[in-house]
Amino acid sequence: IWTKQKQETIEKIPPETEKIIAEAENSNVYNNSELDTIAHKEIKVENTQVEENNERLEIVENNNDIDPQETKEWLESLSAVVYSEGPERAHFLIKQLIDQAYKEGSNIPYTQNTPYINTIPADEEIKSPGDQNIERKIRALIRWNSAVMVVRANMRDPSLGGHIGTFASAATLYDIGMNHFWRAKSNKFGGDLIYFQGHSAPGIYARAFLEGRLDEKQLDRFRQEVYPGGLSSYPHPWLMPNFWQFPTVSMGLGPMLAIYQARYMKYLINRGLIKDEGRKVWAFLGDGEMDEPESLGAIGLAAREKLDNLIFVVNCNLQRLDGPVRGNGKIIQELEGSFRGAGWNVIKVIWGSYWDPLLANDKTGHLVKAMNETVDGEYQAMKARDGAYVREKFFGKFPETRELVSSLSDKDIWRLNRGGHDPHKVFAAYDRATKNIGSPTVVIAKTIKGYGMGKTGESVNTTHQTKKLDIDDLMYYRDR
């Protein structure tokens, strides 16, 4: 039961891991060309950048626009500046216009929010160099072992608890870091520091099992530290000093501790006590966790101290312990405003690669308008239903968006993925975060709570409390 095979047990981890990798290399589990399958029929990306920019700037109907033609001319002028002179020049001109407006007595409303789309455009992404067949296979095994560990523990004692849905939503976020960005301590390098989100601990144990660092007996003692070799419920170096680096529970401790750890490292570097090796401090957080006073309490200090060695990754699966995080609001936009206002570099990872052709063909702006206007409760409901529901409730908001997906089947629409589950989108965000200079960075990734759990747990309010899966749900989770 510890692997994706039916009721089989891995006895020798390293050889089995080698076998898994070999199988993945020869399989067609995941093909890079798969990302292009939705870009078919009427969906095509324009070849000419100037024409594309101009066509994208057609005005969405606005009853407050007394002169749409004038608005169109202004937008086309801005597009021409961006294309011919670059975004820096465009930013300068916009700032000059805003300053002049204030001088003229115009009180322009201020916002720290950008549209509800990815911060990094598709054509600027750095693609992951990894073998997606192997990485996806390994990710599936880790998700499976993480879930089964909790299920097996609660079959013995229902009071043990544990969390399946959190790591299921965050697996890709951790996987990309583990495979491509985090550097271990050695004799020549101090190592990066990672604050793991507390409720995702089962997934970290599951990966350690696949790597041969933990055995099956230890996984069978999850949340049973009283037994020799038992695993602690959450990251805790006092209980497991040879495994965990930092404690991150209760919720809210991780982000504040990470800020002061990054600050202390800068302190030591600035005084010549340690070398500047480009080490990073990563903190993985939940969107519900960000409501804890400690979570946002010191973000101003991080910006003032210019802690560019600090990276937050907020897993926005839209759900907390007892329900939605912001049912009638948008937690990603709220967090963006808080962090940008404090002076952080913000990278939003909202939409996966399957959305790219649709966004490229959103000539009227109605798709982005629908994205901006849809609240988190609606997004959560969509991922608990099916493609037909998404077509009607989301794309059906405007005739233009309905037409945009007219060539897609309900199955195609259901495959439109969220950014936090797309390895290429996550890789691009991490790559940019590690290269940022002069400020801390927060990566805000949109995911699905209980990803892969099917009707029992995917995007439903009870996901966080789900400790058991019946045989049908286990088979679905295994085969997905």
PLM segments and residue spans:
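Hydrophobic alpha-helical scaffolding
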Residues: 64-68, 83, 87, 128, ...
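Short acidic (Asp/Glu) and glycine-rich catalytic loops that position anionic groups and cofactors
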Residues: 73, 151-154, 181-185, 238, ...
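Cofactor-binding active-site loop characterized by glycine-rich and histidine/acidic residues
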Residues: 130-142, 146-156, 163-305, 328-329
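Acidic, low-complexity intrinsically disordered tails
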Residues: 2-61
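N-terminal amphipathic, basic-rich helices that act as targeting or association modules
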Residues: 35, 40, 45-211, 475-478
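Long, well-ordered, tryptophan-enriched scaffold segments
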Residues: 316-480
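Generic beta-sheet signal
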Residues: 192, 279-281, 310, 439-447
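Short internal beta-strands
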Residues: 194-197, 309-317
